[in-house]
UniProtKB/Swiss-Prot annotation:
A biological process from GO: exocytosis
Protein's UniProt name: Exocyst complex component EXO84
Subunit details: Component of the exocyst complex.
Presence of keyword Coiled coil: yes
Protein's organism: Yarrowia lipolytica (strain CLIB 122 / E 150) (Yeast)
Record-linked InterPro entries: Cullin_repeat-like_dom_sf (IPR016159), Exo84 (IPR033961), Exo84_C (IPR032403), Exo84_C_1 (IPR042561), Exo84_C_2 (IPR042560), PH-like_dom_sf (IPR011993)
Biological function: Involved in the secretory pathway as part of the exocyst complex which tethers secretory vesicles to the sites of exocytosis. Plays a role in both the assembly of the exocyst and the polarization of this complex to specific sites of the plasma membrane for exocytosis. Also involved in assembly of the spliceosome.
Lineage of producing organism: Eukaryota, Fungi, Dikarya, Ascomycota, Saccharomycotina
C-alpha cells in the first residue's frame, strides 16, 4: 500500500477514507472509451474493495508516534533568497503564516516587475513586446496574473498622477493669470501716475513762469522799484553788493525817515517786504492803521501809510513813513496763528513783535503774505544765530590759541602786529569780499589742512600727521605773511599733541616694532632727547618689574639664571632699538651709560644673593657660568662690559687688581 502525497487535497482524502463512497463512485463511473490518449481503468471486484477498505480502516486506527517521521535534513532543499525578509514581513503583518495557495516566487522573477517595471514602462523608447517577453519568459499563470494586476495598478496610478498634475498646472495657470492681470493694472496705474506727474511738472513750470512775470510786473508798480531778478548776477560778490545798495537807495527814496533808522553800511540788504498789514490794539485787538513791513538781514522796519490831500487835484495819495525799527537780535517775533500752550490767544494771520516790554501786533488778510513774512524771518534769524555762533567760536579758538602759545612760547607775547592783522582779516565779511581769492581763501585752506591733521591724529595715523606738519611748518619769524604765521601757530599746537601721543606709546610696554616707529617719528619732529630719556627710563622700570616677578625658592643658581636672562636680554633689545632710531655716534654714550648702570645693578644683586658662599663651591661656579653665558650676548650689540663682572665672576683676580 502506498501513502498519498503531502499535497493531496482534503476532499480526496475524505473520499479515500470512506470505502463505501469510493465504491459507489467506482460503480457510477462510466467506462472510458479507449482512444489514442485515454486508457480504460480496470474493474475492481468486491473482495478487492473490501480488502482495500479494511486496510484503510487499519491505517486510520494506527497510533502515530510523537517524534514524527524521521527524515534526512541534509537532503532538504535550501530556502529561497530573501526568505528571512518574507518571514519577518509575515510576522509583522500579524503573525499569519503564508498559505499554500500563495505561491512564493523567487526574487529573481518578482523583482523586475516590482522594482524596475515602473521606471522601464515610463521610458519613451520602450519595446512592449520585448519587455513582456523578458518579464514573463519563465512565469506561470499566477505570476502572469500578478504582473497584469500590477500593470493595471500602475496605469491607475499614472492616470491619477496625470490628473493631479493637470489640476496643479491649471491652478498655477490661474494664479499666473491673476498676477498678470494685477501687474497689468499696476502698470496702468503707474503710467497714469507718470502722466499725472508730467502734467503737474508742466503746471508747476507754467505757474513759476507766470509768478515770475507777475512779480516783475508788481515790482515795477510797487513803491519800491526793485531791479528785475533775472538781471541779478549772484555769482559775483560785487554785483550782489551793488544790487543791495540799489535796494537800500530805493527804500530810502520811498520810505520817509528810513535813512535815520537804517544807515547804509556794506552788507545790509532787504530780505522781504510785504504790504496789506494792519496794526492791532494789543488790548482790544481792533485795527489801528495800515502798515508796510520791510525785513532786512539785521533789522525789522515798520512803515505807516500816511494819507496826504492834494489841494490842486483834490486827490488823496498815500506815502510810507518809517514808524518803528528794531534790531533782530533785540526782538522776539511770534506767530500768533500757532498755539503756544496758552501763552497768547490764537489770531489767524497775525504776528507779534516784543521789544523791551512793548508788544506790537500786526495782522493781514492774506495768508500768503503772512506765510512769506514768517518764513523769511525764520530764515534770517537762523542765519543770524549761525553767524553769531561761528564768530563766537572763532574768537574763542583764536583767543585760546594765542593764550596757549603765549604761555608756552614767551617770544610770541609781543606779536601784537599778528593779533591786529588777524583781527583785520577776520572783520566784516563784506569788507573783504573784493579780496575773495586772496587772504580769505588762504585762511579757509588753513582750516581744511588743520582739520585733516586733527582727523589723522585722532585715527592714530601718526606717520601721515608727521609728514603734514613737516611739510607745512615754517618757523620764519621775519615773515610778514599773516596766514603763514597763523598756520605755524596751529601746527605747533598739533605738533605738541602728536608728541604727547608718541611719548605715551614709548612709555607703554609695547612691542619693539611699535616703539621703534614712535621713536623714529619723535626724532623727525625734533623731540629725540625727550624720547630717549623716556624710553631708557621705561626699559629700566621694565627690568625691575620682571626681576621682582622672579621667586627665590631656595634654588640660588635657578634664581640667578632667571635674573641674568631678564637683565642681559632686555639690555640687548634696548640697545638694538636705540641703534635703529639714533644713528648719530655722539648719542652712543647714552646707551652705554644706561647699560653700565644696569649691569652694576645686576652685580649688586649677584653679590647680595651669593653673600657668604665661597667661590670654589659648586653653587657659586654654576652662577658664574650662567652669568658669563648671558653676558656674552652684549658684545653682539657693541657693549663690552665684562670688566664690571670681574668682581663677582673672578673675585680672586678682582682682589689682586
Amino acid at each position: 500500500m502506498s501513502l498519498e502525497p503531502p499535497n493531496q487535497s482534503l476532499r480526496s482524502h475524505r473520499q479515500t477514507a470512506n470505502p463505501h463512497v469510493m465504491a459507489a463512485a467506482v460503480q457510477k463511473q462510466k467506462p472510458y472509451i479507449q482512444d489514442s490518449t485515454h486508457l480504460q481503468l480496470p474493474n475492481v471486484g468486491d473482495k478487492d474493495r473490501e480488502r482495500v477498505g479494511n486496510m484503510v480502516k487499519r491505517r486510520f486506527s494506527a497510533r502515530i508516534p510523537g517524534q514524527g517521521v524521521p527524515y534526512d535534513a541534509a537532503a532538504a532543499p535550501s530556502l529561497p533568497v530573501g526568505a528571512g525578509s518574507m518571514i519577518d514581513d509575515a510576522v509583522a503583518a500579524g503573525g499569519v503564516p503564508v498559505t499554500k495557495s500563495k505561491t512564493m516566487t523567487s526574487p529573481a522573477k518578482a523583482a523586475p516587475v516590482a522594482s524596475g517595471a515602473s521606471g522601464m514602462l515610463l521610458k519613451e523608447d520602450l519595446d512592449a513586446h520585448t519587455f513582456v517577453t523578458q518579464q514573463l519568459a519563465t512565469s506561470n499563470a499566477e505570476e502572469v496574473d500578478r504582473f497584469v494586476s500590477k500593470l493595471k495598478s500602475l496605469k491607475s496610478r499614472l492616470v491619477d498622477e496625470q490628473r493631479e498634475a493637470m489640476y496643479t498646472n491649471y491652478n498655477s495657470f490661474l494664479t499666473v493669470n491673476k498676477e498678470i492681470l494685477a501687474l497689468n493694472s499696476e502698470v496702468k496705474s503707474l503710467g497714469q501716475a507718470v502722466s499725472n506727474f508730467n502734467v503737474a511738472v508742466s503746471a508747476m513750470v507754467e505757474d513759476a513762469l507766470e509768478s515770475t512775470s507777475s512779480k516783475s510786473q508788481e515790482s515795477s508798480q510797487s513803491s519800491l522799484a526793485l531791479p528785475d531778478s533775472s538781471a541779478r548776477n549772484r555769482n559775483s560778490m560785487v554785483m550782489l553788493e551793488n544790487m543791495w545798495a540799489n535796494e537800500l537807495a530805493s527804500l530810502f527814496k520811498h520810505v520817509e525817515g528810513a535813512v535815520k533808522y537804517l544807515p547804509a553800511i556794506p552788507g545790509r540788504h532787504v530780505v522781504a517786504e510785504s504790504g496789506a498789514w494792519y496794526q492791532l490794539n494789543a488790548a482790544t485787538w481792533k485795527p489801528l492803521r495800515p502798515v508796510h513791513m520791510f525785513l532786512l538781514n539785521d533789522h525789522l522796519l515798520i512803515a505807516a501809510k500816511n494819507r496826504k490831500k492834494d489841494n490842486m487835484q483834490m486827490q488823496q495819495t498815500q506815502t510810507l513813513v518809517a514808524d518803528q525799527c528794531w534790531p533782530l537780535s533785540d526782538i522776539e517775533f511770534l506767530d500768533l496763528s500757532v498755539s503756544r500752550r496758552g501763552t497768547h490767544p490764537v489770531v489767524p494771520n497775525a504776528v507779534s513783535v516784543v521789544c523791551g516790554g512793548v508788544t506790537c501786533v500786526y495782522q493781514t488778510e492774506k495768508p500768503a503774505q503772512h506765510a512769506k513774512v514768517v518764513s523769511a524771518f525764520k530764515k534770517v534769524a537762523g542765519e543770524g544765530r549761525k553767524n553769531d555762533t561761528n564768530k563766537t567760536q572763532q574768537q574763542i579758538r583764536l583767543r585760546e590759541s594765542m593764550t596757549y602759545y603765549a604761555a608756552r612760547n614767551p617770544s610770541l607775547r609781543g606779536h601784537k602786529e599778528l593779533l591786529q592783522g588777524l583781527s583785520n582779516s577776520k572783520g566784516h565779511s563784506r569788507s573783504s569780499s573784493v579780496d575773495i581769492t586772496g587772504r580769505t581763501k588762504n585762511l579757509r585752506e588753513i582750516d581744511d589742512l588743520v582739520n585733516d591733521l586733527d582727523v589723522k591724529i585722532a585715527h592714530r595715523r601718526f606717520a601721515e600727521a608727521t609728514d603734514i606738519i613737516l611739510e607745512n611748518i615754517k618757523d620764519d619769524k621775519e615773515s610778514t605773511d599773516i596766514t603763514q604765521q597763523v598756520l605755524d601757530i596751529k601746527l605747533h599746537q598739533r605738533q605738541d599733541e602728536l608728541v604727547a601721543h608718541l611719548i605715551d606709546d614709548v612709555a607703554t610696554d609695547t612691542s619693539n616694532t611699535a616703539v621703534t616707529h614712535a621713536l623714529g617719528l619723535l626724532v623727525r619732529l625734533g623731540h629725540g632727547d625727550q624720547a630717549r630719556g623716556v624710553y631708557l627710563e621705561t626699559r629700566r622700570n621694565l627690568i625691575h618689574k620682571r626681576t621682582r616677578q622672579v621667586e627665590l625658592l631656595g634654588d640660588i643658581p635657578g634664581y640667578i639664571a632667571q635674573v641674568a636672562v631678564t637683565y642681559f636680554r632686555l639690555i640687548r633689545s634696548t640697545a638694538e632699538v636705540f641703534r635703529k632710531c639714533y644713528t648719530d655716534n655722539h648719542l652712543a654714550s647714552s646707551i652705554a651709560e644706561w647699560a653700565k648702570s644696569m649691569v652694576e645693578e645686576f652685580v649688586l644683586l649677584f653679590a647680595r644673593q651669593l653673600y657668604g658662599v665661597k667661590p670654589d663651591t659648586q653653587t657659586y661656579q654654576q652662577c658664574v657660568s650662567i652669568t658669563r653665558q648671558q653676558a656674552a650676548q652684549l658684545s653682539e650689540v657693541g657693549l663690552n662690559l665684562d670688566y664690571l663682572l670681574d668682581y663677582v665672576l673672578s673675585p680672586a683676580r678682582a682682589s689682586k687688581a
